[in-house]
Structures are given as structure tokens and as C-alpha cells.
Amino acid sequence: MSKKHPVIAITGSSGAGTSTVKSAFNHIFINVGANPVIIEGDSYHRYNRDEMKRVMEKKERIGNKHFSHFGPEANLFGELEKAFKDYGEKGRCKKRLYLHSDKEARPFGQKAGEFTPWEDVGKDTNLLFYEGLHGGVVDGDIDVAKYVDLLIGVVPVVNLEWIQKIHRDKELRGYSAEATVDTIHRRMWDYINYITPQFSRTHINFQRVPTVDTSNPFIARDIPTLDESFVVVRFRDHKYCDFVYLQDMVHDSFLSRPNTLVVPGGKMGFIMELILREEIEKMLNH
């Protein structure tokens, strides 16, 4: 961990409230004068889009049906750990971008699904901000979580996560529900072993819980809205919260356990800003 060059990581699946999280952190960074290095988790995938497809087909031919972007074989965990460690020690690290679309790729003269070259970043920045699947991952001797000063989990309950995944893949990628269910099956081993353990290492978790029936996520017509949800906020340490203040600020919030605050789903971005702004200010002013 670093007091001079803090590292903040958001860990959670794509679509688990990403737009709300990004909006909240944009507001915080502007308000506290932060100038972050921003690292996206998919830039630390091991393979580009075409390579991943070929490797996955090869793995399936030899009987490995669990190869996925959730696990170590398809990611550069060691390089991610080094980036966090280097930034914490020196305020510098290496970074690249994953180009999701033709629009993103065009300015670089590359194709969608490729990576930009690695570059040295960090000059004139005062924190590193990571958002992706593996901000708190541990795998053997690799311990990414060890170098994170503030680790935040953003994760819906699993049925809601699957509903979001099915709808997102259909709308953005044109995948059938059956194809997405196959992806969920393939990722499950890595999900259990590499994704979920991270949420026990976080300092704060934000978990969205729907108040409508999601018991069969594979036939759900709609994604439950924020207003059809609560957000469960779990704190590992009471130093990150003033429960009396937070309950005064958020109408209809309540404590479900001594370290757990529940707020209406529509207040997810607001509660993030209330809780995290003060912590980030402390880091920058230390």
C-alpha cells in the first residue's frame, strides 16, 4: 500500500452498475482535484479478441470447457500486480488500452478487439484508479489486493447479474440467450474461484438486491430497475463510515447489521459519493 501514490480499485462484473460507478467517481475526482491514471481491467487480458477465440476453440478440443476471461489463463495477473506495486512505489506504471469497437480503434489505426502498445504513465497524476474483474484477485504467489489502498466491490446478487449479462449480450453483441447461458456455464469454475473471493477482501461492498422476482433469470424479460432494488453496503471497518450521518442523508436507509447499511436502489450513486469522497480526500491530503 502507498500513502504517497494511492491505488483505488473497483472490482466487479461488467454491467454490475458500471455507469453509476463511473459517474460517481467522475464527480468525486472533479470535486477533490484528483488527476488519476485510469486502468481498465480488460486491458490486462492475455489475448486479443481473435486470439481468445482461437485459444478457446483449442481448449475445448482438448476437453477444457472452463477456459474464460474470469481466470488466470486468460489474464495477466502478474503484470496487473506489478502495475499496482510500481504505481504505489514510484507513481509510475505501464498501461495499454483494449479497443472494444471500431470507433475506439480508428484513432489508433487498429482493429476492434486489439490492444494498444504498452506505454509508461503516471506523470502529473496523484492516484491510480482501476475498474475491472480482478482488482482484488489472489492467485498463488500473485496478490493484487495487497497493493490496493481502497478496494471496492460492486456486485449484484447472482440472478440479477445473469439477467444483466443475458440482456447486455443480446443488445450489444446480438448473442442469443442460449449462447450467453453457455458462457455463464463456461465461466462458473473461474467465477467461484477467482471472482467471488475478492468480495471478502474488499474494504466496502455495494451489492444491488432486486425487490422483484428474479428466481428464473433465464426467462426474465426486463432488467430490474434501480428503483426496484435496494443496495446493501457492507463495511469491513467502521472507520469508513458514519452511520448516523449516512442515515440522516439518505431517506429510508437502515442498518441490517452493525456493519451493513441498506439504501434505496435509486440512491446508489449518491451513497457512493457520500462514503467515498471523504476517503479519497484523506488519501490525497495525507
Regions found by a protein language model. Name each.
Residues 21-22, 26:
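Post-Walker A alpha-helix
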Residues 13:
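P-loop (Walker A) phosphate-binding loop of NTP-binding proteins
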Residues 18:
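Conserved lysine of the Walker
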Residues 2-8, 125:
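Pre-Walker A (Motif I) flank of P-loop NTPase domains
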Residues 114-123, 144-146, 158-286:
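C-terminal accessory "lid"/substrate-recognition subdomains
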Residues 72-144, 186-199, 209, 213, ...:
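Glycine-rich phosphate-binding loop used to anchor ATP phosphates in small-molecule kinases
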Residues 128, 151-152, 205-206:
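Short, well-ordered beta-strand core segments
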Residues 32-40, 44-104:
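Conserved nucleotide-sensing/catalytic segment adjacent to the nucleotide-binding pocket
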